Regions:
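Long, charged amphipathic helices and adjacent flexible linkers at domain junctions
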Residues: 70-73, 238, 400-454, 458-461, ...
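Nucleotide/phosphate-binding sheet-loop regions of phosphoryl- and nucleotidyl-transfer enzymes
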Residues: 1-424, 458-461, 468-473, 479, ...
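Conserved alpha/beta-domain cores
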Residues: 99-100, 553, 563-909
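Glycine-rich phosphate/ribose-binding loops and adjacent secondary-structure elements
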Residues: 365-367, 468-476, 480, 488-495, ...
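C-terminal accessory/binding modules appended to enzymatic or scaffolding proteins
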Residues: 14-22, 434-477, 843-859
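Short beta->alpha connector loops at strand-helix junctions that form conserved
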Residues: 46, 484-486, 505-508, 596, ...
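Short mixed-charge
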Residues: 77-89, 519-521, 761-770
Length: 909
């Protein structure tokens, strides 16, 4: 490995690397090299590659330092040559910064050290050379503080305690009777350096390292070590950044923003990262170093006059006060500002994306320390992409790929007002099951949510230990849903996403007492009627009412969706159970309904009575009487769906849940039902007990119901076909697909298809008319995937129900996985939650096999998925490459799936 190049130098408009070497040099190192090559003023330095980070963890510190030493010493000589200073010299000491830089931007997640090379001799030399002793000692103080924290582990002893260095600074300021760090004198700073080093000796038992080379190796290894710190690991997990990528380390000659009033440091953006507005903006501080801007120790000032005036207006600062106390860089250093503005424009035009820039002004000279593609909100992401397309900076394909599918979520749901959030009190945190923001009074039962909306026109927060299909109406009428149990694909989560409702699930610390109608959590007692607020994007629950604002879907969003459609191969449908859901999905660009769950319709109004009548009937004749009552209701529902979808395909799933989900389980409700049906209570109780199942997910449900009670399939088929023919008569085309759930054996499906076909023929004969329809099945039992060649003899389409297919393939209950999932993720047993991101090697392999076998039997077999994975970007990508025809997801995930489908097609091309 000795011949492997581990260090790449840059400086004086030359560089050994370039902007295309992100994998090797990290984003920062690659861009520092590229900025040099295009003539931007950048302090000279070198970058140690990401491969060395992997070596560090594989071989250890000592081996890696040995491998690096010759190249680092050579690279340091290059900096010395370009600066005229020498590392470790007593007369002209070279000071450097040591920074991390992964290939994906991870702002603030890893460690940085400034002013490295400082010691008792260097500080005197710097003071003499600059004729500015205060600056020299301030730089020394900062170095000891940063090095002590990052390399020597000088952290607070507990979360209740403060940073040990900050405590010493506060004590010094109190002793001197001053408020700001900048008010400390040279002698104060000398005293602080002495006290800092004493604190290091006391806590570590070692003297603070004085040798610059020892300092450098300590810093380089600490930056590599920070790749595996807690916050970096969490950030990578949240942003799907692989741990094996590693970080590069960039070492640069220091330039100083803290040399006096002609020096400054700042951060700028070429466009507004929050709104996407084409407005150069940023903050700076006079006489400061980089970390001061982000640390918030002093109030940063705005770079532009326009930005400064906007800031002053928001802060109720007068124009006179703004000019005197908080002037913009444009006003204070107009020549430097002009150069900075030209550079940011040059960088944006060159990299063709919004730039996040770090800069330092040393004694009136501007230096660029970093540029990277800036992080941005979902709204800004779309606006910037579409603006740059209109400006001719990027083409259509780039505009589509520039927008992250998952970030579209931010545009589709209500959000909390940012100002109100600052004062919000978090009482518990659960899983961010369905994005958005919701606020309202607490209720514990679905009927109370319905009642509150009906009587008070107020949407409540429905709080449940867990939800069931019976809670559907209450969930619909609620502002948001909070559950103590359940994961990201639990009933509450799936249904809430389908409705576009804010939902926080799996908040296990909640102690819910249905009888007392109270919640106890973390020392709070919340009673029914008390207000709480839910953040479905973070999983946080707040005490009281937090103001919300509706998401604003601009014209740019619509244009992006049109581009997504243009470049997609995979179609996107929606899971929708009502005409309202269908209309919402259609508005978001759904090209059909991939899953209509007929059981959800059974809970509307008085229908549940007819359903229960059917379930509790003694014989087939009794069931048929009850089903006859349901027929017109179901027919009306389907008519609404067919009309809403305007000729796009509608896939209707026949009854799926076990019958016990539809019957009352409490004595009071059972007695009311007995009274309504005019039968003894004991008969109802006995029947309910008889319907109970030990493992209902694998029990009497799906096609098993239709095969044991054929009259259910008959009624539903008749309702579907009659509705389709009624809508067809109005001149609206209808494309009907009838889907049989939970098939594991081709004979099950054949039996159901015979019932469907016979019933359809009866309707055609009665009406003296016909229409085309298809019969297919959900592939959710692993055996169905393995025997897909047989099932395709009967089925005209496959729809993969990935929720249940995942449960049965992995043997995980999606409602109970929260008990062990965090441990499995932490230990690396699982890479992702398989109910959120499709398990490609297991479930995915079954899907590929089923598609291959199915199309071997029926060449034009249409295949799609209708589980929640249909709206998850990486799962959508898998579906594209697996050769599926469509994905189907919740209406509010349709835009995400559409964009993900376009990404997959463009990546393949």
């Amino acid at each position: 490995m000795a011949d492997v190049k581990r260090v790449y130098t840059f400086g004086n408009k030359e560089a050994e690397g370039n902007g295309k070497m992100r994998e090797l040099l990290g984003g920062k190192g690659a861009n520092l090299a590229e900025m040099n090559l295009i003539g931007i003023p950048v302090p000279p330095g070198f970058t140690i590659t990401t491969e060395v980070c992997s070596e560090y963890y594989a071989q250890g510190r000592e081996k890696v330092v040995g491998l690096l030493r010759p190249e680092v010493e050579k690279a340091m000589k290059n900096i010395e040559k370009l600066t005229g200073m020498k590392f470790g010299d007593k007369e002209m000491p070279l000071l450097v910064s040591v920074r991390s830089g992964a290939r994906a931007s991870m702002p603030g997640m890893m460690d940085t050290i400034l002013n490295l090379g400082m010691n008792d001799q260097a500080v005197e030399a710097v003071a003499k050379r600059t004729d500015n002793p205060r600056f020299a000692w301030d730089s020394y103080r900062r170095f000891v503080q940063m090095y002590g924290d990052v390399v020597l582990g000088m952290k607070p002893a507990s979360k209740e305690e403060h940073d040990p260095f900050e405590e010493l600074i506060d004590a010094q300021k109190e002793k001197r009777g001053v408020k700001n760090d900048t008010d400390l004198t040279t002698d104060d700073l000398k005293e602080l350096v002495h006290n800092f080093k004493a604190a290091v000796k006391k806590q570590t038992g070692e003297d603070f390292p004085a040798n610059p080379w020892d300092q450098l190796w300590g810093a380089i290894c600490a930056v590599f070590g920070s790749w595996m710190n807690e916050r970096a690991i969490l950030y990578r997990k949240l942003n799907n950044i692989p741990a094996e990528w590693g970080t590069a380390v960039s070492v640069q000659a220091m330039v100083f923003g803290n040399m006096g009033d002609n020096s400054a440091t700042g951060v700028a953006f070429s466009r507004d990262a929050a709104t996407g507005e084409n407005l150069f903006n940023g903050e700076y501080l006079i006489n400061a170093q980089g970390e001061d801007v982000v640390a918030g120790i002093r109030t940063p000032q705005q770079i532009t006059i326009e930005g400064s005036r906007r800031w002053a207006k928001a802060q109720n600062v007068s124009e006179a006060e703004r000019r005197s106390k908080y002037p913009s860089l444009e006003e204070v250093m107009p020549a430097v500002y002009k150069e900075l503005n030209e550079i940011q424009h040059h960088l944006e035009q060159y990299f063709k994306d919004m730039q996040d820039i770090e800069f330092t002004i040393q004694d009136g000279k501007l230096w660029m320390l970093q540029c990277r593609n800036g992080k941005r909100t979902g709204a800004a992401m779309v606006k910037i992409a579409m603006d740059m397309l209109r400006e001719g900076l990027i083409d259509e394909k780039t505009a589509v790929l520039r927008c992250e599918p998952a970030k579209l979520d931010e545009l589709l749901h209500p959000v909390f007002d940012k100002t109100a959030m600052k004062n919000a009190k978090v009482i518990v945190k659960g899983l961010p099951a369905s994005p958005g923001a919701a606020t309202g009074p607490v209720v514990f039962f679905a009927e109370d949510a319905e009642k509150m909306l009906k009587e008070k026109n107020q949407r409540a927060i429905l709080v449940r230990i867990e939800t069931s299909p019976e809670d559907l109406k209450g969930m619909l009428d609620a502002a948001g849903i909070l559950t103590a149990r359940g994961g990201m694909t639990s009933h509450a989560a799936v249904v809430a996403r389908g409705m576009g409702k804010c939902c926080v699930s799996g908040a296990g610390e909640l102690q819910i007492d249905y009888k007392a109608r109270t919640i106890r959590v973390n020392g709070y007692e919340i009673k029914e009627g008390d207000w709480i607020s839910l953040n479905g994007s973070t999983g946080e629950v707040y005490l009281g009412q937090v103001a919300t604002q509706a998401a604003d879907l601009s014209g740019d969003f619509g244009q992006l969706m049109e581009l997504a459609r243009k470049y997609s191969v995979l179609k996107v449908r929606a899971n929708a159970d009502t005409p309202k859901d269908a209309a919402q999905a259609f508005a978001f660009g759904a090209e059909g309904i991939g899953l209509c769950r007929t059981e959800h319709m059974f809970f509307e109004g008085d229908r549940i009575k007819a359903v229960r009548e059917m379930i509790l009937a003694d014989d087939e004749a009794g069931r048929r009487v009850a089903l006859a009552k349901l027929l017109p209701m179901q027919r009306g529902d389907f008519e609404g769906l067919f009309k809403a979808m305007q000729g796009h395909p509608v896939t209707v799933r026949l009854l799926d849940p076990p019958l016990h989900e539809f019957v009352p389980h409490f004595e009071k409700e059972q007695r009311e039902l007995a009274k309504d049906m005019n039968v003894p209570y004991e008969k109802i109780a006995a029947k309910v007990e008889l319907l109970a199942e030990v493992n209902p997910m694998l029990g009497h449900r799906g096609c098993r119901l239709g095969n044991t009670y054929p009259e259910i399939t008959e009624m539903q088929t008749r309702a579907i076909i009659e509705a389709a023919m009624n809508v067809k008569k109005t001149g609206i085309p209808v494309h009907v697909e009838i889907m049989v759930p939970l098939v594991g054996n081709h004979k099950e499906l054949r039996y159901q298809k015979n019932i469907i076909d016979q019933t359809a023929e009866k309707v055609f004969a009665e009406r003296n008319d016909r229409l085309e329809y298809m019969v297919g099945t959900m592939i959710e039992v692993p055996r169905a995937a393995v025997t897909a060649h047989q099932i395709a003899e009967v089925a005209e389409f496959f729809s993969f129900g990935t929720n249940d297919l995942t449960q049965m393939t992995l043997g995980f209950s999606r409602d109970d996985i929260a008990k062990f999932l965090p441990i499995y993720l932490e230990k690396g047993i699982l890479k992702n939650d398989p109910f959120q991101i499709l398990d490609r090697n297991g479930v995915g392999q079954l899907i590929r096999e089923a598609v291959f076998k199915g199309r071997g039997t029926r060449e034009n077999l249409k295949c799609g998925i209708c589980g929640e994975h249909g709206g998850e970007p990486s799962s959508v990508e898998f579906c594209h490459f697996a050769g599926l025809n469509y994905v189907s997801c919740s209406p509010f995930r349709v835009p995400i799936a559409r964009l993900a489908a376009a990404h997959a097609a463009l990546k393949e091309a």
